[in-house]
Amino acid sequence: LNTVNEIQELCTRFNKQQVVYISMGFGNPYGDPYDLGIVEKFTDILVTLQVPIIALADTIGVAQPNQIESLFKSLIRKFPAVEFGAHLHSNPMTSLAKIEAAFNSGCQRFDGAI
C-alpha cells in the first residue's frame, strides 16, 4: 500500500488518475479467506489514499452474476465518489450475464479484450 500511496501522490501532482485493481475481487483460488468484508476493507483503504478509480477483477473467472451484482451495489452505495470498474474473466456462455449484472448495479467502466 505504500507504493499505491506514492503513485497516488505522483498522480495528484501531475493531474493524472490512478486505477487500482483488486485482484481476486470475487474469490480466492488458494483457499485463503474471502468475503465481501475483505473487499470493502481494501476499498476503504484505497479511498483513504484518495484513489479515484477502483476495478474489481474476477481474476480466475469464478464470479456469478448475483455475486457481481451484490458486490457492486454494496461498494457503489458505500463509496459513491469512487468510479468502479469491472475486469471480468468469462466464456461466451456466461459473459453477457456477468456484464449485465455489473452494469445494472451501477458499474460503468469495463475492461475488454478482443
Residue ranges and their predicted role:
Residues 1-18, 24-86, 93-105:
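Alpha/beta enzyme core
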Residues 58, 107-114:
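Glycine-rich phosphate-binding active-site loops on the catalytic face of alpha/beta enzymes
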Residues 85-89, 113-114:
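Beta-strand segments within the central parallel beta-sheet cores of soluble alpha/beta enzyme folds
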